[in-house]
């Protein structure tokens, strides 16, 4: 198997960004267009906690917005249709 095929079979292993499980949840809800308040209601946490996770996600992806983080996550194969 060539390197390209191996990499495309395991995109998460090759993704340059490592998110915590909670950051992954927050990112998924961001992809669905939810606000920090809405995500807080869904995950049973405070809006400020969601904003903390969003800040970490933006820093890890080195992007300025949630939309840019979602786009990068899709490119890296980190978000799939549920």
Question: Where on the chain are the PLM-derived regions?
Answer:
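Linker/hinge segments immediately adjacent to helix-turn-helix/homeobox DNA-binding domains
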Residues: 1-22, 28-29, 37-44, 77-82
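Intrinsic structural disorder/low-complexity segments
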Residues: 7-10, 56, 72
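Alpha-helical structural signal
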Residues: 23, 54, 67-70, 75
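Hydrophobic residues on short alpha-helical segments
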Residues: 27-31, 58, 70
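Short amphipathic helical patch at the helix-1/turn junction of helix-turn-helix
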Residues: 29-31, 48, 74
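Recognition helix of helix-turn-helix DNA-binding domains
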Residues: 35-68
